[in-house]
Amino acid sequence: MKIKNGDTVIVISGKDKGKTGNVIEVLAKKNKVVVEGVNIVTKHQKANGRGVESGLIKKEAPIDVSNVMYYDAKNKKGTRLGYKFEDGKKVRFMKSNNETIK
């Protein structure tokens, strides 16, 4: 999976199409990512005896990695990623302009 924690991505399909956000968590085995401010769901929280209150909680749910693209801030659009070797190290790069990603 070429998307990593901390990457800025844009949603390319679904109810949140066009929104951008940072990747909070990558679920590699499920091929999903959790993006900040995207795919917000309402969870019904049940109270327990240890001080956790009941109520409705809004939180981000995972979204399939095929529905997001890496966001290129310079060009203000999504781009595909690839891997290449520079100085013996494997680095990610944007396929649209061949810039490496730190």
Curated annotation (Swiss-Prot):
<dbReference type="Pfam" id="PF00467">
    <property type="entry name" value="KOW"/>
</dbReference>
<dbReference type="GO" id="GO:0005840">
    <property type="term" value="C:ribosome"/>
</dbReference>
<dbReference type="InterPro" id="IPR005824">
    <property type="entry name" value="KOW"/>
</dbReference>
<dbReference type="GO" id="GO:0019843">
    <property type="term" value="F:rRNA binding"/>
</dbReference>
<comment type="similarity">
    <text>Belongs to the universal ribosomal protein uL24 family.</text>
</comment>
<dbReference type="GO" id="GO:0006412">
    <property type="term" value="P:translation"/>
</dbReference>
<keyword id="KW-0699">rRNA-binding</keyword>
<dbReference type="InterPro" id="IPR005825">
    <property type="entry name" value="Ribosomal_uL24_CS"/>
</dbReference>
<comment type="function">
    <text>One of two assembly initiator proteins, it binds directly to the 5'-end of the 23S rRNA, where it nucleates assembly of the 50S subunit.</text>
</comment>
<comment type="function">
    <text>One of the proteins that surrounds the polypeptide exit tunnel on the outside of the subunit.</text>
</comment>
<keyword id="KW-0689">Ribosomal protein</keyword>
<dbReference type="GO" id="GO:1990904">
    <property type="term" value="C:ribonucleoprotein complex"/>
</dbReference>
<dbReference type="InterPro" id="IPR041988">
    <property type="entry name" value="Ribosomal_uL24_KOW"/>
</dbReference>
<keyword id="KW-0694">RNA-binding</keyword>
<dbReference type="InterPro" id="IPR003256">
    <property type="entry name" value="Ribosomal_uL24"/>
</dbReference>
<dbReference type="InterPro" id="IPR008991">
    <property type="entry name" value="Translation_prot_SH3-like_sf"/>
</dbReference>
<dbReference type="Pfam" id="PF17136">
    <property type="entry name" value="ribosomal_L24"/>
</dbReference>
<comment type="subunit">
    <text>Part of the 50S ribosomal subunit.</text>
</comment>
<dbReference type="InterPro" id="IPR014722">
    <property type="entry name" value="Rib_uL2_dom2"/>
</dbReference>
<keyword id="KW-0687">Ribonucleoprotein</keyword>
<dbReference type="GO" id="GO:0003735">
    <property type="term" value="F:structural constituent of ribosome"/>
</dbReference>
<protein>
    <recommendedName>
        <fullName>Large ribosomal subunit protein uL24</fullName>
    </recommendedName>
</protein>
